[in-house]
Amino acid sequence: SSTSSTSSTSSISPAREIVLSGINLGTYGRDLTPRIAFLDLLRRILDETSLERLRLSSIEPQDVTQDLVDLFASADRIAQHFHMPLQSASDRILAAMHRWYRSAHYARRLDLIHDRLPHAAIGADVIAGFPGETESDHAATVAFIERHPFTYLHVFSYSPRPGTKAAAAPHQVPAATIKQRARELRSLSDSKSSAFRRSQIGRTLRVLTLHRDARSISEHTGAEYTPALSTNYLRVQIPGIFPSNQWQDVAITSQEGNYLCGQILESDPPPLCESSAYSASLRYP
């Protein structure tokens, strides 16, 4: 009944952030009549809804244009977060994968984003051990990642899938080599992520609180905290217990593990309660 439907949804808070996801998001609308550009879809979402934050799950590098980056820079309701699949920085391997871009093209997109949005998160998917990948190919990928402003990587170890061209390709990379290369890439990802978190110390981030669980207790002080997510895809610990789906402004003071820590500047709404271990300075691990 309409009554039961109303009562079952009345206590649910509207989503303040929505992730727009799909395969090849940037090609949206090209098969429609009349044709619709992906950029127009984003503008309509911003213009015709009250959504407070829109995040893209991923976008191919060839779809990252000056106009798209300008929209991200001018609209504070779009999360400053780009996830662009890279897979490899060896042009030879990219060709073998039938990717539509090469490393120089990808690098130009990185520069476009970083020059306009220096604090944006930039993530990438990388595959270790694609058939035919030599030590030189792997080294090219590592060097490319080292010199560009990536903030995190999703590293995948290649594994053959029956019926695919790659599975039947010559020069399969030994499993032990794939494991070693993936380990090196993950270590590089950790280093990049840590450097990005450190670069945010001294800034104020507007974060959205997430659901707490039994693990939301500091290993260092025993203080309870509420996890939150920033526009640039960083995990932040807010001291105290807050409901989920709430905005908080946090002045970042330090990094502890994979989280950032800081001082609350505003509280909307106030904490449900304060932990007994909640420090007066509001600094937390």
Residue ranges, per PLM feature:
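Short, low-complexity, charge-dense intrinsically disordered segments
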Residues: 3-12, 276-283
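Terminal RNA-binding accessory module
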Residues: 168-285
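Radical SAM enzyme [4Fe-4S]-AdoMet core and its adjacent flexible, acidic
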Residues: 28-46, 50, 96-97, 160-191
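Contiguous mid-protein beta-loop-alpha structural module that forms a pocket-lining wall or clamp
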Residues: 133, 148-150
